[in-house]
């Protein structure tokens, strides 16, 4: 996928965030939550919360957009907007109403399932997960503001930008596009990379207060599962939490903060 993207996508995405935060009233919608059975995986929400906290520190007004059960889990601790599960007939109207209500300056999708050519949502195993999936695609399709898509597998919102490359893979790729696509081995890591760039631009080490394991425990306590093992563990896509901690430390060093 990386070869299909114009180099500099991390920097361009970070610049879109900076531009959106130019006013004190800046509103950033962050869509996340990939369903696994009747719950959600750790990859996505972890990075979404990190972006939420960073945007808040920079004076923005972030809003997490997700379906049940994730929306209900986060509602007590974060500003959230809940979207309906499997409501195919009303998903465009739902998006229009939300966009009219919130008037976002930027929309970010991180590890959100994207509609495929058949009009369904599928996981990396090719299983149809539409019945448990809320639709965030129309938020990006109808947006009058810039949009960022973050993903790692090819079936996430934003991957329509590289659909010609993905058709050669044995997956059901997403056809939903975005203004700037950011990819990483784990979507959460892309969020940390963007925060590192924002930190460098502002001269503030925002990753220093990023307690990844604490948020992972928080999500686990609400029933999250690893997207690979489908088990309630403190892991991200089958990888131990220490790997993310090491990545965050490396990003801080690269940014010149430690």
What is each model feature region?
Residues 157-258:
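C-terminal functional extensions of proteins
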Residues 78-101, 105:
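A glycine-rich helix N-cap at a beta->alpha junction
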Residues 1-27:
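Positively charged, low-complexity intrinsically disordered leader regions
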Residues 59-67:
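Short internal beta-strands
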